[in-house]
Structures are given as C-alpha cells and as structure tokens.
Amino acid sequence: MHGKYPTLKDIVLELTPDPVGLHCNEQLDSSEDEVDEQATQATQATQHSTLLQCYQILTSCSKCCSNVRLVVECTGPDIHDLHDLLLGTLNIVCPLCAPKS
C-alpha cells in the first residue's frame, strides 16, 4: 500500500474463505439439568391434560330436530371422546321430547 489511506484496490485477499460445518461430533453427557427438565415437561403435560374447560355444544334433538345447547366441563381428550360419541350412536333428546320417550 502506498499513501496514508488504503484503498480497496490495494487490499488483496490471498486466502479464500473455508466453509465451516455447523454440525459438530461432540456428544453431551446426560446431566441432572436435562433429567429435571424432562420431569418438568412431563408434569406440565399431565397438568395440561387434567385441566377442565367449559365447552358449549350445539346439536339437534334426535326426535324433533330442534336445537339443543349443552355446556360440559371436561378435559381436552374427553371432549374428543364426546365428539366421537355424538357422531356415533349417542343421541341427544330435547326436554320436550324426553317425557315422550
């Protein structure tokens, strides 16, 4: 380089960049932190599945086809079971048709 300030044409890069692999071959030993984290996740999953929520269901009476509204409180998996029952052989009857049955 000549002069007080370098210019781009004066800078010559002789080395080409080498690609660096981001995957390393190191393996970490199981630590207590990982075990604690897995236990915490399992506890949270159990608590999440046992949380009760209210669900509003709108269906029709199997006798007169009028709308019937239900509110149930259950867990997520249980509402899926109820959904399967309603699509299957379970029939809901309105209060007017119930005494006639």
From Swiss-Prot:
Keyword Transmembrane helix in annotation: no
Post-translational modification summary for this protein: Highly phosphorylated.
Entry remark concerning the domains of this protein: The E7 terminal domain is an intrinsically disordered domain, whose flexibility and conformational transitions confer target adaptability to the oncoprotein. It allows adaptation to a variety of protein targets and exposes the PEST degradation sequence that regulates its turnover in the cell.
Residue span of motif LXCXE motif: 22-26
HAMAP family: PPV_E7 (MF_04004)
Swiss-Prot/TrEMBL keywords: Activator, DNA-binding, Early protein, G1/S host cell cycle checkpoint dysregulation by virus, Host cytoplasm, Host nucleus, Host-virus interaction, Inhibition of host innate immune response by virus, Inhibition of host interferon signaling pathway by virus, Interferon antiviral system evasion, Metal-binding, Modulation of host cell cycle by virus, Oncogene, Transcription, Transcription regulation, Viral immunoevasion, Zinc, Zinc-finger
Motif residue range(s): Nuclear export signal: 79-87
Protein name as it appears in the record: Protein E7
GO biological-process terms attached to the record: DNA-templated transcription; symbiont-mediated perturbation of host cell cycle G1/S transition checkpoint; symbiont-mediated suppression of host innate immune response; symbiont-mediated suppression of host type I interferon-mediated signaling pathway
Stretches assigned to coiled coil: none
Protein task: Plays a role in viral genome replication by driving entry of quiescent cells into the cell cycle. Stimulation of progression from G1 to S phase allows the virus to efficiently use the cellular DNA replicating machinery to achieve viral genome replication. E7 protein has both transforming and trans-activating activities. Induces the disassembly of the E2F1 transcription factor from RB1, with subsequent transcriptional activation of E2F1-regulated S-phase genes. Interferes with host histone deacetylation mediated by HDAC1 and HDAC2, leading to transcription activation.
Matches recorded under InterPro entries: Papilloma_E7 (IPR000148)
Quaternary structure annotation from Swiss-Prot or TrEMBL: Homodimer. Homooligomer. Interacts with host RB1; this interaction induces dissociation of RB1-E2F1 complex thereby disrupting RB1 activity. Interacts with host EP300; this interaction represses EP300 transcriptional activity. Interacts with protein E2; this interaction inhibits E7 oncogenic activity. Interacts with host TMEM173/STING; this interaction impairs the ability of TMEM173/STING to sense cytosolic DNA and promote the production of type I interferon (IFN-alpha and IFN-beta).
Native species: Human papillomavirus 13
Single GO molecular function: zinc ion binding
Zn finger limits (unnamed): 61-97
Stretch list, region E7 terminal domain: 1-40
Entry keyword Transcription: yes
GO annotation, cellular component aspect: host cell cytoplasm; host cell nucleus
Highest taxon above the source species: Viruses
Subcellular location as annotated: Host cytoplasm; Host nucleus
Annotated family: Belongs to the papillomaviridae E7 protein family.
